[in-house]
Amino acid sequence: MTTKPFVNVIGAGLAGSEAAWQIAKRGVDVHLYEMRPVKMTPAHHTEQFAELVCTNSLRANQVTNAAGLIKEEMRRLDSIIIAAADENAVPAGGALAVDRTPFSQTVTDKLANHERVTVHHEELTAFPEGPTVVATGPLTSPGLAEEISALNGSEGLYFYDAAAPILDKNSIDFDKVYLKSRYDKGEAAYLNCPMTEAEFEAFYKALISAEVAEMHDFEDEKFFDGCMPIEVMAKRGIKTMLFGPLKPVGLENPKTGEQPYAVVQLRQDNAAASLYNIVGFQTHLKWGEQKRVFRMIPGLENAEFVRYGVMHRNTFMKSPDVLLPTYQSKQRSDLFFAGQMTGVEGYVESAASGLVAGINASRLALDTEPVTFPATTAMGSMAHYITHTSAKHFQPMNANFGIFEPLKQRIRDKKERNQALADRALASIDTFKETL
């Protein structure tokens, strides 16, 4: 007797719900495991699938914004999450925001009533047999986190997210910064933002008085002991940063031949060199405060923040070492991961990873090769980034045009460039869709 094809999906958040939907609509049975309400997490309040635990905004809806473009790609692939969001949208200008309770209820009802989906309300602490999508989120239960660590090695799983802000290279003033490595060791790998004593003191005063974001109840400072926020370091004394990330020694300005009073370094963040992060600037500051204070750094007066610095509880894997761009485990080919634990950041990005993982898990269950989404698409660029960026400095990332495969022609105007990237992405997804 032949066994019917099936896939296990662990977790019914945004990623797991999307994965389950994509699998079921391809005629494959789904065993969907969700531990709520039997065991709740500190962040969830209901037993509904795809519960939005923070904001009700799914961010921009226009395709000239990468967050909007990824939504449109998902619409074209019949995303349950985007369909539910469109159905339960509330006025939000150019953004897509939802009435959170009916949004989650829509997703729950569609999955619970689908003939291919069997829901199991229980906690799993080990990977089941057969094709499986693990989408247990940033608050993965300890038992399963241990299982993931055992699969990937002790260094393969992080328990907090401590990331410095990431900037668009095109927004940096290159008349004020210079390329150099400390003591000229190796290749000149850093952009350096020099500060005078007066500039440093003004920056210091703004930094120590800036507003800090509130931590959630389930977050604890102990997660961050190994990675001090820049504002905490600053409060230990006006000179402290000068012996840390703002140390000027060995970074003489080639334009003047002099050593600045302080230097903020920017490190290349992706292979295309379109993104740079501010070295050592992991922070708890509110996002608006980050923009205000960090734009005081010479050369960053008009900086565009692709991602703000964050420090929060987050279970995520060192994906460049352990995942393929199909969202498959390198250790076990019938095991897929999706959602924030893969290093994608944001509601929609999590759902998008579930969409890709779900399609590929269903293909595996049907004895078909998994597929890699084109890097010219928002979904493909996310999958490529989290599996090809530097493992040493890996931190979660949201959808942005900086991680896309560059256009063949150079377009200076930002709006025109974004439109060209969007046009190419949607043409790619339409062509790619025909192969699925």
Swiss-Prot record:
Signal peptide: none annotated. Its EC number is 2.1.1.74. GO terms for molecular function: flavin adenine dinucleotide binding; tRNA (uracil(54)-C5)-methyltransferase activity, 5,10-methylenetetrahydrofolate-dependent. InterPro entries: FAD/NAD-bd_sf (IPR036188), MnmG-rel (IPR002218), MnmG-rel_CS (IPR020595), MnmG_N (IPR040131), TrmFO (IPR004417). It is found in: Cytoplasm. One of its GO terms (biological process) is tRNA wobble uridine modification. This is Methylenetetrahydrofolate--tRNA-(uracil-5-)-methyltransferase TrmFO. It comes from Latilactobacillus sakei subsp. sakei (strain 23K). NCBIfam families: gid_trmFO, PRK05335.1. Pfam families: GIDA.
